[in-house]
């Protein structure tokens, strides 16, 4: 290490042993405003923070961009794309971008308008660890070192609930035994007395239900709250190490222009001019009526104060939004009444309906107030699993959840097309909420695609998607281990008090301080996500919000149970998938030379066949008889039973000789129909040429008359075949 390179370490004690996160700066990416490398084991992530020289004064938002670059060489792999190089970011990379952005964004000075970009590049990946939390810490370190107006550092850790204990930075092997997996980011408050939570992303694991069946403790609200507390020591240690590094190598704090949205004189003038009318408009319960009245009041505000503040129209708009926010929050804090007249714990009107769309495999419509979600389920053969080219160990996805948010869902116009980061994030959250209750591949050998269409939006379409998806999956006949529902919680912070809101509206999300989404079954939490505009929230406040969310979740589950209480019969339009297990050494025989045998079975039966390396064969067809026909053919090859004299088969003529015809009874097993036995097919007359009565490819009902010591089979036409020939003549 040369003199310009500095390092600091965070050592986190866990029940499974110490975990060491190492930070370095001064060696790589020296031209960036701030750069840092974070290590966890052999995982190495470089983060570089840069800032534009000039601010974007015209913007009314903070232009922060976070990018995560997954380099396949980090895992010793070549990208699987046609050009063999990295292309657009993977879903994992996009989700990690969101994990970094969410705690970083509220930590910058308000009013900053210089473009800031944070780029985290995964240079090496330890096969035992996930890189996302390493990237969050690296991004915080590089930004802390950059001299920007940033109230960091921020520490982030993953904690897994393994064997009844919370373990920081768990390995993949430990996560396989965990019932809950949680990423927590936070900062040490100014007096150093506590850690404030800034971001949470968590879910039950796919193996949770099975682990619970073997006695593992469930991830209840109390357990999850304890996990937030368990994350605090690790966050504190990570922040300490970053502060130590900053003391050695941080650039001097730089002055950046801060653009105030409005001045107090504009706010005071607006309050005097339209304060009462705005307050009355905000008390209208219906969204459409409220929005119409608010548009009128907004126009009135511009007319009344525009002449006083000529050239400051942008300030008028910002002050109007600030006054609206102030009135909404004040009513909640002082009256415990919200925009639409509900109490702080009240849920909007609920509606659930299944089997809404014809011909699809499963569908449901879920409504909560003006939020309306259509869920649609499609089932397919396992070969339709999604192949993912990513650094994480999972290479395929059997359950795929896609979320769509068209502009008409909010009554607006806008771009439609490929999903944006928000849509990808919402789909991933709903996917994680449902993964723990999905049946295993063995129990339900189907690839499942779930699509959530946000047809109307006024608060938490992602949690509405969880509810609609549960209903749709049950309607499709998917045997879920338990139904899952979700609810979004909000928070208003005034002075030293916190008011928690159940089932927040879109406006309450915009004007509040927290968006806390919680999904789960009746017995445990399956997923949660926290975003906050504050510098942090006490863990005790989040624990209380979890308990408040549970009551709402149970009420929603009751409504869903009235719509559908158990899995329906599978749709007649869904494929039928069955399985058969064969010895591994028989796989080659089933496939045949150049796939001849398996292709023949598929052609004869009309089924689609997928062969797994362990000898499991999945057979999919449009109906049950076709699938059973393919299974019988496979069993005849790989799990054969010796035929017996007297058994009858619908065989196929495969070869004709001068002494008879060879008939295929099952794949790989033929019998001889001697020419002397063909009299019954020619009205009792002697047959001179076999070709006169039989042709290759002809189907014929035959009966086994003899099996000799060498296993050779002799056949004769069955009585049904003779009768059919007589009738034809």
From Swiss-Prot:
Keyword set includes Nuclease: no
EC number(s) given by UniProt: 2.7.7.8
Cofactor: Mg(2+)
Superkingdom: Bacteria
Ranges annotated as spanning the membrane: none
KW Transcription regulation (keyword) present: no
Domain S1 motif: from-to ranges: 646-718
Compartmental location: Cytoplasm
GO biological process: mRNA catabolic process; RNA processing
One GO MF term attached to the UniProt entry: polyribonucleotide nucleotidyltransferase activity
InterPro entries to which the protein is assigned, alphabetical: ExoRNase_PH_dom1, ExoRNase_PH_dom2_sf, GPSI/PNP, KH_dom, KH_dom_type_1, KH_dom_type_1_sf, NA-bd_OB-fold, PNPase
Gene Ontology CC terms: cytosol
Pfam families noted in UniProt: KH_1 (PF00013), PNPase (PF03726), RNase_PH (PF01138), S1 (PF00575)
Known catalytic reactions: RNA(n+1) + phosphate = RNA(n) + a ribonucleoside 5'-diphosphate
KH domain residues: 575-634
Alphabetized UniProt keyword annotations: Cytoplasm, Magnesium, Metal-binding, Nucleotidyltransferase, RNA-binding, Transferase
Entry binding sites for Mg(2+): 509, 515
Protein role: Involved in mRNA degradation. Catalyzes the phosphorolysis of single-stranded polyribonucleotides processively in the 3'- to 5'-direction.
HAMAP family, per database record: PNPase
Family, similarity comment: Belongs to the polyribonucleotide nucleotidyltransferase family.
This protein's name: Polyribonucleotide nucleotidyltransferase
Gene transcribed to yield this protein: pnp
């Amino acid at each position: 290490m040369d003199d310009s390179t500095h390092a600091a370490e965070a050592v986190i004690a866990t029940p499974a042993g110490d975990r060491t996160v190492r930070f370095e700066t001064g060696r790589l990416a020296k031209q960036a405003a701030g750069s840092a490398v974070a290590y966890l084991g052999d995982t190495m992530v470089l983060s570089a923070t840069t800032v534009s020289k000039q601010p974007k004064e015209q913007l009314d938002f903070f232009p922060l961009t976070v990018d995560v670059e997954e380099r396949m060489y980090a895992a010793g792999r070549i990208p699987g794309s046609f050009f063999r190089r990295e292309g657009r970011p993977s879903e994992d990379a996009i989700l990690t971008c969101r994990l970094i952005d969410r705690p970083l964004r509220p930590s910058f000075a308000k009013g900053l308008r210089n473009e800031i970009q944070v780029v985290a590049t995964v240079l090496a990946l330890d096969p035992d660890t996930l890189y996302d939390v390493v990237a969050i810490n690296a991004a915080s370190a590089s930004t802390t070192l950059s001299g920007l107006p940033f109230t960091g550092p921020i520490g982030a850790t993953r904690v897994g609930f393994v064997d009844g204990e919370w373990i920081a930075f768990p390995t993949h092997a430990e996560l396989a035994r965990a019932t809950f997996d949680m990423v927590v980011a936070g900062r040490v408050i100014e007096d150093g007395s506590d850690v404030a939570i800034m971001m949470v992303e968590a879910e039950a694991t796919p193996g949770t239900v099975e682990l619970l069946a073997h006695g593992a403790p469930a991830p209840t609200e109390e357990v999850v709250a304890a996990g937030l507390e368990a994350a605090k020591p690790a966050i504190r240690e990570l922040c300490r190490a970053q502060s130590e590094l900053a003391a050695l190598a941080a650039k001097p704090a730089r002055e950046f222009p801060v653009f105030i949205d409005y001045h107090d004189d504009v706010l005071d003038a607006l309050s005097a001019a339209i304060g009462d009318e705005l307050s009355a408009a905000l008390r209208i319960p219906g969204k459409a009526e409220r929005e119409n009245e608010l548009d009128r009041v907004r126009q009135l505000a511009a007319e009344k104060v525009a002449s006083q503040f000529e050239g400051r129209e942008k300030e008028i708009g910002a002050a109007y939004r600030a006054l609206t926010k102030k009135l909404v929050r004040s009513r909640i804090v002082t009256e415990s009444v919200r925009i639409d007249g509900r109490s702080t714990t009240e849920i909007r009107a609920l509606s659930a309906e299944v089997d809404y769309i014809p011909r699809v495999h499963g569908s449901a419509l879920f409504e909560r107030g003006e939020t309306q979600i259509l869920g649609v389920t499609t089932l397919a053969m396992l070969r339709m699993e999604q192949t993912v080219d990513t650094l994480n160990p999972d290479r395929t996805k059997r359950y795929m959840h896609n979320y769509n948010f068209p502009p008409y869902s909010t009554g607006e116009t806008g771009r439609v097309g490929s999903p944006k980061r928000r849509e990808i994030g919402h789909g991933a959250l709903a996917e994680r909420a449902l993964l723990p209750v999905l049946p295993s591949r063995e129990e339900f050998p189907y690839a499942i695609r779930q699509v959530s269409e946000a047809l109307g939006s006024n608060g938490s379409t992602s949690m509405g998607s969880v509810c609609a998806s549960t209903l749709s999956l049950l309607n499709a006949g998917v045997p879920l281990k338990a139904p899952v529902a979700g609810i979004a919680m909000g928070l208003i912070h005034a002075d030293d008090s916190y008011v928690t809101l159940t089932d927040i509206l879109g406006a309450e999300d915009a004007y509040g301080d927290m968006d806390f989404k919680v999904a789960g079954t009746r017995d445990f939490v399956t997923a949660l996500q926290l975003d906050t505009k504050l510098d942090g929230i006490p863990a005790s406040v989040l624990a209380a919000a979890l308990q408040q969310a549970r009551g709402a979740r149970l009420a929603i589950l009751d409504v869903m149970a009235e719509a559908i209480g158990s899995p329906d019969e599978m749709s007649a339009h869904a494929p039928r998938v069955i399985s058969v297990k064969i010895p591994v050494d028989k796989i080659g025989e089933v496939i045949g030379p150049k796939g001849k045998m398996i292709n023949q079975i598929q052609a004869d039966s009309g089924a689609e066949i997928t062969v797994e390396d362990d000898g499991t064969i999945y057979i999919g067809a449009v109906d049950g008889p076709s699938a059973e026909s393919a299974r019988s053919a496979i069993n005849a090859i790989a799990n054969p039973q010796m035929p017996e004299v007297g058994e009858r088969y619908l065989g196929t003529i495969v070869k004709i000789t001068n002494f008879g015809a060879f008939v295929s009874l099952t794949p790989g097993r033929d019998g001889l129909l001697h020419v002397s036995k063909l009299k019954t097919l020619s009205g009792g007359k002697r047959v001179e040429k076999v070709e006169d009565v039989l042709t290759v490819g002809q189907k014929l009902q035959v009966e086994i008359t003899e099996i000799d010591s060498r296993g050779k089979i002799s056949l004769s036409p069955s009585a049904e075949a003779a009768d059919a020939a007589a009738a034809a003549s």
